[in-house]
């Protein structure tokens, strides 16, 4: 992923040096586990622990060797072996293991670290959502369906929806992250013929990982597909929120807008512009994460016990998707935390249709008072369509219709068009969401 969208801590997880450090962590765990069982000499394991290293120079050496041997794990073991300084000890590095014992298990360590960062981001975003939902718990806003005014809500209720979805994302992601926290040291085809299941489990335990109950040469890629699917859902939620902010920032609506800095400029040609560029960026980058999930599905089907077709794909989609999820969560947290809200504009828009938004309540009240539903629907729609076409006040038209007023008197009609009546259950919904 380009540096523009990479936050520092997540970037370190996926750096070349970070990756090779995790590879070395797996190699050391294996040699120490084998030393405890008398397979590897204790002195050799100690020498490997003490001297083997990965730094910028070693990373360059790995690249140099890989250009010759055309195999990254072999280049790694050669370069790290040189740092040990004792050929007798270095020969035990990578003992009994195949490349993907190291690569897949180390990848699990990287994903565990990346997942911790993302989980922290999700929690922090949820805290901001809850704060802003409570801030606007009783701020009336028109609810829209198909982009058209429907019935009243509160802006806090809209944000509460975002909060609840974010909480589901946290639960989903936690499950997917646990599915990825597994290692395998079962050899070239998964039969554990060189080291055995007990040693495999012990190495994984030393690394703080579960052991994959069964594997081929690789951990099965349904786990990866689930993980990336969860990231796709997570970032789709962020896109959904960003898209809503973009709609609310339209000039004709202007009920909310993303933060706009004091020295920020919206256009090189039009000085008046305050464009929702951050929200647009979120919408764009979420598409990349979704596309990457599709690539992960393609990696599930491999030839027999493994081919390498998934490897090149994962070198892109795993870093890019976790880096983008981290970036987008931080971005949306900033946007929602600094979002400007215009309650007066919300109320003006809500009132702009002259009571049309209460047509559903009027229909219900007429039926409850004894009118036939088809008759009531016809009367209400007749006035609603006329109010749309002539831009007249719906409430006044209804109050002048004897077919309606003989069923609902003035007091009853005032109750029909009462905004507070529409919003009377908001507190109960909040108690349910934030319990």
Regions found by a protein language model. Name each.
Residues 1-192, 196-202, 211, 266-267, ...:
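A helix-coil-helix interface module used to build multimeric assemblies
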Residues 1-22, 46, 65-69, 270-435:
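Glycine-rich cofactor/substrate-binding loops
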Residues 30-33, 118, 122-125, 129-132, ...:
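Amphipathic alpha-helices that form helix-helix packing interfaces
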Residues 31-32, 110-122, 231-240, 245, ...:
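Alpha-helical support elements that line or immediately flank enzyme active sites
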Residues 40, 253-254, 372:
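Conserved hydrophobic residue
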Residues 99, 191-192, 204-206, 211-218, ...:
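A structural signal for small-residue-enriched, beta-sheet-centric alpha/beta enzyme cores
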Residues 157, 225-233, 361-369:
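Short, well-ordered beta-strand elements within core beta-sheets of diverse protein domains
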Residues 200-293:
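Acidic, glycine-rich loop-and-beta core segments that form the ion-binding/anion-interacting portion
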